[in-house]
């Protein structure tokens, strides 16, 4: 499957303890990157964010996390302009959900996350599904030869 890839959610938006990395200064098309990063990046590349959420073993947190995504989390991100490329269940670590988001560039990513974090529907959803988790996030730009741009 050519278009299958990954992504997941922001650390500052959760009430539970999280570990999230800061995004790079630039992400997306080669023209927006430093020369050392742009060499293999496409001119029409988007910014991709791969996120891994590992839920605690308590209270069935992974099931609550999946329900939160099913119920509204994906829709809230899409409402604010993100493309949710895919969402996966890790088989080697059943308490981890992996997902991938796509944006035009870093500025668009920041705009999407600001809208998401301030969305009243997100506040209600977060309270309904109070999941304790840790977050790993990776930012990528597609290569100039990638099928997914």
Tell where the protein language model's regions lie, with residue ranges:
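Short, surface-exposed beta-strand/loop patches at domain edges
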Residues: 123
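Positively charged n-region of N-terminal signal peptides that target proteins for export
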Residues: 1-4
């Amino acid at each position: 499957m050519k278009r299958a890839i990954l992504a997941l959610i922001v650390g500052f938006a959760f009430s539970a303890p999280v570990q999230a990395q800061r995004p790079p200064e630039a992400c997306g098309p080669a023209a927006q990157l430093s020369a050392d990063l742009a060499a293999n990046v496409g001119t029409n590349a988007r910014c991709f964010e791969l996120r891994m959420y590992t839920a605690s073993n308590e209270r069935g947190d992974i099931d609550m996390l999946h329900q939160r995504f099913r119920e509204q989390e994906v829709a809230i991100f899409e409402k604010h302009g993100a493309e949710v490329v895919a969402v996966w269940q890790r088989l080697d670590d059943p308490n981890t959900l992996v997902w991938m988001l796509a944006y035009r560039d870093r500025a668009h990513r920041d705009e999407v996350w600001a809208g998401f974090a301030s969305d009243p529907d997100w506040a209600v959803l977060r309270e309904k599904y109070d999941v304790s988790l840790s977050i790993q996030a990776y930012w990528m730009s597609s290569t100039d030869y990638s099928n997914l741009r």
